[in-house]
From Swiss-Prot:
InterPro entries: Spermatid_TP (IPR040433)
Positions with biased composition (Basic residues): 26-56, 73-92
UniProt gene name: CXorf51A
Biased composition (Polar residues): 58-70
Protein's recorded name: Uncharacterized protein CXorf51A
Position of the signal peptide: none
Organism of this sequence: Homo sapiens (Human)
Region (Disordered): 1-108
Positions with biased composition (Basic and acidic residues): 93-108
Amino acid sequence: MAKVTSEPQKPNEDVDEQTPSTSSTKGRKKGKTPRQRRSRSGVKGLKTTRKAKRPLRGSSSQKAGETNTPAGKPKKARGPILRGRYHRLKEKMKKEEADKEQSETSVL
């Protein structure tokens, strides 16, 4: 069999033609051509597939507790009606009016 020899690749001369050097670009470094990103170690990483997260075992099959929970806020028991100064004053005035009316009706 005949031996096949590969020719060494020649540097791309088209890059130099695309960006002619001018006075503003003479001091700058030439930018690298975009390439495929490589990992730092230089070894190609394996493709990984992500699994869906599953619920903890047994937690979904457990039944809810049998205790009844109230639907809303529990109502507070009504305590004695707190009467302030003005409430007592109104009651006093009502009593006086009632007494006046009774005394007027009894006089007639």
